[in-house]
Design a protein with these regions (language model features):
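Conserved C-terminal helix/tail region of periplasmic/extracytoplasmic solute-binding proteins
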Residues: 395-468
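Short glycine- and hydrophobic/aromatic-rich loop-to-beta-strand nucleating segment
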Residues: 200-201, 303-306, 310-311
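N-terminal secretory signal peptides
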Residues: 1-79, 91-100
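Sec-dependent signal peptide hydrophobic core
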Residues: 81-89
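Short, glycine-/small- and polar/acidic-enriched structural segments
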Residues: 104-252, 261-278, 284-298, 439, ...
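Ligand-binding pocket segment of bilobal, Venus flytrap-like solute-binding proteins
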Residues: 163-165, 254-286, 307, 339, ...
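Secondary-structure end/capping motifs
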Residues: 314-419
Length: 468
């Protein structure tokens, strides 16, 4: 038989090798060709003057918004001190040299060959697509994006300095920095990778059992203890009267194994990342019970981050990484790019999923597994802002469910790890009248408002918890 065909062997595929000569299937070949064409189109779009201007403004606006969560505060500050003084004040509080360094200047890079880890899920879209679209190389970086099997491995490789930066679950840098589950190692969240983009998926056998009050005894999967998935699932169950520690079982399952566990009947459902919610529908083993945006619209999920040591030793390299990932997020936010992005990130070296599955997730036009086609444009989005109030909420849930014991300095931890600095201190230094209290935005989860200035009061409102 030739190296391409083996038509009379029952134990081998008919077509052994692609006609291009490479050792992959024709289907993989077509996916790669489509991905290359889509990447070329997106690269061309990224090089237009229109996108260059949009991207630059997006990055700078993101940085300024980090310091001024409230629009009126930003306007008052600028009117009071003027543009130049404001830029100087802002520059002094950013985590790298200056606003211009973050937004446009390219200082000498301390390190150019970098290894960045990722889990193959759509949450990592900005980090992944920056590679084939050339956003890293445009910043002078030679980046290897490395597919990783699970979150514990991501944690260990960051602690052991095998990765320079990584795709994190957004609560992970908090947990790692505090020494929860591993030796304490200071980590930072540079940007949120995605908002929304998760779902509660149930086995098809439960399609007539949609009321969570009836789920006592269910077995659920989540990707990691320190994940928004775990915290949101626990929140949802508790709001419906179930104790997540005694009335159900919650198991840690790597995202790539969730659909197989659902198919095998090992779990009744999971709150997990896409594309695996949509893949369960695609494989006809599950249905989408609820998008997490319906629990908390705009909630964070994953983050892009690195160690505090890396930032301190490589400030210009970190700034270059920051620019590359924010440029990618700017492109991912534009709905007109989503179908092309699905082609770029679906092949084997990235997500290894059917393009149709990824496209449904990113465009928000999807089959729900119950016979309906849904149209939810903001099913997944890419807002990079690491609000410190998000970190405070995560810390409240860690305390609520017994992951943290004793007193918690919420504000100090949030401001140390999530790289946004409150502008109020610098307004005061400039002689401006400053309202009392931290300038964190408020959030609404299942109809209940969360005020990051009052975390302990918030915790006292919950009847179901694991606090002493």
């Amino acid at each position: 038989m030739s190296e391409f065909f083996d038509p009379y062997n029952a134990d081998r595929p008919l077509m052994l090798k692609c006609s291009c000569g490479r050792d992959h299937s024709p289907a993989d070949h077509h996916a790669e060709v489509a991905a290359d064409a889509a990447a070329a189109t997106l690269r061309a779009r990224s090089e237009t003057a229109e996108f260059e201007a949009y991207s630059q403004e997006f990055i700078e606006a993101t940085l300024v918004k980090a310091l001024f969560p409230h629009e009126q505060e930003r306007r008052n500050f600028l009117r009071a001190v003027g543009k130049k003084t404001a830029m100087a004040a802002i520059a002094s509080v950013l985590p790298v040299a200056s606003l211009q360094a973050m937004a446009e200047d390219k200082g000498p890079l301390e390190k150019t060959n970098l290894k960045i880890g990722f889990i193959p899920i759509t949450c990592a879209t900005p980090l992944i697509m920056a590679h084939p679209l050339g956003f890293y190389s445009k910043q002078g970086l030679n980046v290897e994006v490395t597919k990783t099997a699970g979150w514990a491995l991501i944690r260990d490789k960051m602690i052991n300095k095998e990765y320079d930066a990584t795709h994190f679950l957004s609560p992970m840098p908090l947990a790692i920095s505090m020494g929860l589950g591993a030796n304490a190692t200071p980590m930072n969240v540079a940007t949120i990778q995605n908002v929304n983009g998760q779902a509660i998926t149930l086995s098809l056998k439960h399609k007539d059992n949609r009321d969570p009050k009836n789920w006592k005894g269910f077995k659920f999967g989540v990707p990691f203890d320190y994940s928004m998935h775990n915290f949101l699932l626990r929140y949802y169950l508790a709001e419906n009267g179930l104790n997540p520690d005694t009335d159900v079982q919650i198991r840690v399952i790597p995202p790539a194994e969730m659909v197989a566990n659902l198919r095998a009947g090992n779990i009744d459902g999971f709150l997990g990342p896409d594309p695996f919610n949509q893949r369960a529908v695609f494989d006809e083993v599950g249905f989408i019970h609820m998008l997490t945006k319906d629990l908390w619209n705009g909630h964070p999920c994953c983050a892009f981050g690195t160690s505090t040591e890396f930032i301190q030793k490589n400030p210009n390299t970190f700034a270059a990484l920051y620019r590359a990932v924010l440029t990618s997020a700017a492109m991912a936010r534009l709905p007109g790019n989503r179908e092309l992005i699905a082609k770029v990130i679906s092949p084997t070296q990235y997500l290894n999923q059917p393009e149709a599955v990824i496209s449904q997730v990113l465009t928000g036009k999807f089959a729900d597994g119950l016979g309906k086609i849904q149209n939810v444009p903001d099913r997944a989005d890419f807002d990079p802002m690491p609000w410190q109030s998000l970190a405070v909420w995560m810390l409240t849930q860690m305390k609520r469910w017994g992951y943290i014991k004793g007193n918690v300095d919420y504000k100090q931890i949030a401001e140390k790890i999530f790289l946004i600095t409150d502008a109020r201190k610098h307004m005061k230094d400039l002689g401006q009248t400053v309202p009392a209290g931290p300038s964190y935005i408020k959030h609404k989860i299942m109809g209940k408002e969360f005020d990051a200035a009052k975390p302990e009061e918030y915790l006292k409102t919950f009847a179901i918890h694991k606090m002493g």
